[in-house]
Amino acid sequence: MTGVQTCALPICRPEFKNYSAGIVVQAYLPDAYEFQTELLDFAKARMADGGAPLKMRLVKGCNLEMETVISSLRGWPNPVRTSKTEVDANYLHILERALLPENAKALHVGVASHNLFTIAYAYLLSRKLGSAEYMTFEMLEGMADHVWRAQSQLGNHVILYAPVVKDEHFLNAVSYLVRRMDENTAPDNFLTHSFNLKPGTDTWRFLQNQFEEAYKMKDVITHIPTRTQNRLHRYTPVPPADVMKNEPDTDFDLAQNQEWVRNIFAKWKKSPADSPEIIPLQIGAETVVCEKRHKYMDRCQDDEVCVCEMSQADAGQVMKILEIAEKDPAGWRKTTLQERHKIMYEAANRLGEMRGDLIGCMCAVTGKTVVEGDVEVSEGIDYARFYTTSMKQFAELPDVDIAPKGTILVISPWNFPCAIPIGGIVAGLAGGNTVILKPATVAAPVAWLFAKAFWDAGVPKEALQVVITDREALKVLTTAPAVKHIILTGGTDTAQNIARSNPATPLSAETGGKNAIILTASGDRDHAIMNIVASAFGNAGQKCSACSLLLVERSVYEDKNFQDKLKDAATSMKVGSVWNPGNVVGPMITNKNDKLLKALELEKGESWLVPPRFLDKHKYVLAPTVKWGVRPGNYSFRTELFGPMLSVVCIENLQQGIDLVNSLEYGLTSGLQSLDEGEQKLWKDSIMAGNLYINRGITGAIVNRQPFGGMKLSAFGGGVKAGGPNYCACFVNIADKPGSTTDYTQSYVKAYEQEFAHARDVNNLYGEQNAFRYLPLKNMVLRLFPGDNNEDAKMIALAARICHTPLSISFEPGDDRTAALASLGCPLKEEALAGFLKSMKNYERIRTCGADIPMEMYEEAARIDKYIATAKPVKDGRVELIH
């Protein structure tokens, strides 16, 4: 449906036939001329049918900054014309056609401009053409008052707009005021030069030249829109590159892309008459259909339609899968990084080609909305291109050897069934490892679908195997000696169970989150509400990064206007079946969420700003819910919930809010809504979370733009973020070349200064700053064993000192290192292993000189949720300082 058709729907009703209506046309849009064409056709047809004329208000453009920012963030072409001269020329071109009598009679014209040259041209042209009676001049009160007074003396019809705001709504007007000030002080804006303007001056000639240049261009200017993305067309492959460019999401404003969505629905919305697809079990290059299969029912059709069935592996079949991955019969580990880079780019291109099917599968299997599914596909494509690109910085280090670890097990979640598992498998494959993907069973068909992109791109099926299992067979996977590293995205309890059942196998896990946004009295409340509801209720509140806590400074908390607006924003979100593309909030993955159901009960002092409402008979679809008056310690304050429920807490000031957020066990994402730079600095320097967001939503991290990972119980492993420059280095073995002559002191200092010391923004987007920074560990202990050499200890100690990380060194009785290590300036402690195990809880990280350490250390670290960095130290600081 076109813009004109959308606007025409109400006034096409018979009862409005004799009413006029107006619409704004913005000349800075290349397709404004085509829009005018549609508008003229509609207005003339309406008048021919006896209807009243319509009106077109012609402006230069209202939202240049917003359009530019959105384009920058989404990777879309800027929809506005590239220069003011082009905009002015288009304005004159549209104006000339608008003032033709046969057009102006049906579509009256409002000339909205303060530019004296434009006004004079419109005045003279309308009289020449005889259409002045259908034209009005439109100006703002208080701007160029002398111009409208002169127009009145000429008998022109002038409409003056005077912004009016009530005291209690003044904050709503500030953004309008700022926009006007910004526009009116721009160097090429007419009003900037309008004061004391006189003919013959340099300023006059500058403005005259502006107009004349636009006049010369008006009849030759093109009207081709810049936004031409068309998902109906085949995907345009992107060749391998050394710099990854983020994949643009779908522009759903475009009619052709809306048709594409309808095609997706036609293919993927199954009916009871459709036979469900049977997905086999993959064992290397072979497939087998198992008797035990998981059925996938469409939640948006009341669980009455089976989408597909997927075969589940038993323990014996899992052993075969492990054996194939360990032996690597296809020789994936022997491929070069450049070969893998080329294959990953080809896989990304194939993912781009299957975007529609991936979205359709997510809609049918997991209840994802089209928009949420679309950004997942873009993220998956980004992972496929970024990780081999990021590996190159390590491959180019002159004095290290890099080798794959072996087999990587990737266990992925249901809430991001496309992007996160793709990220995990590419992280493993990029280093030359074989990968076994165990996706969340409830979302596994999505993984089966995207795995085909990798196989077809050149990844051997023996190098990438996809499997779902029962609980017993899963334990075989997670405890197998053949698995050299486990990548998990899932619950904190799952990470703890895996770590404790197999403590010696490295685990990199992104786990739970109890994420909060703090809104202070210095925040832009309208903007904050927009960010809050998007973060809380997107994907039905099931993102691990979702905002489930809102901490509001008392003056805002008690403001009835704020409460009403938050309530209105939550209740205005469209909720329901994902097969309706207008719905923003779809179903939850399960209707057996005991934690959420308990949180939907009120505790003392709590009330509902927006009470819970289930909209379907099986209770998958919960409308956005807002609980008011939640206190620290309440169940919904401290418990991670997967559902569209927001808990609102009153705080006295920002510091109290920071303290409350930091008191939580988790530290995944966190947000601040405040325009006060002092508050921003305090919050940024104090909050304990992996991803921090100021004056924007706290979900939707983008690869390489906002690498993702948390702190505390939100992360297990070395704390290296997914989607960041160091992630792939976790899944390879990096060692000094034999006979390395690197001066590690110089290398560490250089690496610290170039990579680790300063926050940096590698994207440089318009309208958003993304600062990537490294934080030093609070403290670390190095445990030495008799076989460790003192030089390794000195390397680790130097790296810690350069990174400003306090280091203690512990060693066995009888293995006295005091004399050899006294010069390091670290506390030295001679203690038995039993004593050291008791002290491990006091350190943020434990460091060793190798992985061959007592099993008791691994077991204790798993029990107390600590990470042991066991990599042998290397002389290259770009590698060593990561630990």
What are these model-derived regions, one by one?
Residues 1, 8, 122, 343-344, ...:
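Extended, hydrophobic alpha-helical segments in both membrane/secreted and soluble proteins
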Residues 1, 8-242, 845-852:
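Positively charged, amphipathic and often flexible ligand-engagement surfaces
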Residues 187, 194-309, 327, 739-744, ...:
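Hydrophobic face of amphipathic alpha-helices that form TPR/SEL1-like repeat modules
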Residues 291, 295-296, 301-394, 681, ...:
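Glycine-rich loop-to-alpha-helix module at the N-terminal edge of alpha/beta enzyme cores
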Residues 294, 307-313, 328-333, 517-520, ...:
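Short, well-ordered beta-strand elements within core beta-sheets of diverse protein domains
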Residues 398-451, 763, 767, 774-777, ...:
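Substrate-binding/gating loop at the entrance of the active-site cleft, primarily
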Residues 437-453, 466-472, 521-523, 650-654, ...:
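ATP-dependent adenylate-forming carboxylate-activation enzymes
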Residues 453, 458, 480-481, 485, ...:
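ALDH superfamily catalytic-core signature
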